[in-house]
């Protein structure tokens, strides 16, 4: 994966909005999505692979138990894809990865953990169009028909009922992005979407045809506090990311933590 170290708040803005102009429609649009991580060393490894590294086949048992024990709160989940997306939003180990269309929401996730302010963070940028080069013909045709780069749940339902059906579409692994239904406010507020690999053992950034699709923007530890405070000024905070009392309490706890004395690095001083 290509890598670029960010030197300032202004450079971060320049990097995430680079090449956003689309001459064909005379608007600022691009095909990139973003993922913020508090530790730059982290790869694009789904929670399922982290939770069950020795036996990812436990995936079906995880989903079965989620449906069984969460039944009362899942009555509106009529689609397999909606079920998996809901589980991902609430911390269930899945093969999905969280992304956002908003680079500033990604910057929030890269800087929200105050226990990681001594570690470089990162925003990973992905060109969805390049990832879609790996798709089997049936899926590419759906995207062409809809003139888009991202699947909706209805589009997925029309071609594959679950992970097994998805894998049968091609002997070669592939990955794609899909938008969940906004059944909970945090999905809409985070401008969220997910990536998904047809083979749970294959990471999205290891696909041969997508190797040039990713860029890692490294946020040095000494920049985290400045970026964090400036995000608060433009209302990118836990109050918006996690609607409700949970987000308010997270925001208050961080806002009143003694981060300045702990992590402020005057310019020109040794960091």
Where are these regions (language model features)?
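Catalytic-core elements of nucleic-acid end-processing and repair enzymes
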Residues: 1-271
């Amino acid at each position: 994966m290509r890598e670029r170290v960010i030197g300032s708040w202004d450079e971060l803005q320049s990097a995430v909005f680079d090449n956003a102009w689309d001459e064909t429609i005379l608007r600022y649009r691009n095909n990139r999505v973003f993922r913020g991580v508090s530790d730059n060393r982290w790869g694009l490894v789904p929670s399922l692979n982290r939770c069950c590294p020795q036996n990812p086949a436990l995936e079906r048992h995880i989903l079965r138990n989620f449906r069984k024990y969460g039944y009362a709160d899942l009555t509106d989940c009529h689609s397999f894809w909606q079920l998996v997306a809901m589980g991902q939003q609430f911390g269930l180990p899945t093969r999905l990865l969280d992304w956002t269309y908003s680079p500033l929401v990604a910057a929030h996730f890269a800087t929200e953990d105050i226990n990681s302010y001594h570690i470089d963070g990162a925003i990973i940028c992905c060109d969805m169009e390049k990832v879609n080069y790996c798709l089997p013909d049936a899926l590419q045709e759906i995207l062409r028909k809809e003139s888009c780069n991202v699947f909706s749940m209805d589009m997925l339902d029309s071609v594959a009922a679950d992970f097994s059906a998805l894998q049968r579409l091609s002997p070669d692994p592939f990955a794609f992005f899909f938008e969940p239904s906004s059944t909970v406010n945090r999905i809409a507020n985070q401008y969220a979407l997910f990536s998904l690999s047809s083979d749970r053992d294959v990471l999205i950034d290891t696909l041969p045809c997508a190797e040039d699709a990713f860029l890692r923007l490294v946020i040095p530890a000494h920049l985290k506090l400045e970026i964090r405070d400036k995000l608060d000024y433009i209302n990118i905070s836990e109050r918006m990311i996690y609607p409700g009392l949970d987000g308010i309490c997270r925001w208050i706890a961080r806002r009143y933590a003694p981060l300045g004395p702990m992590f402020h690095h005057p310019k020109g001083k040794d960091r």
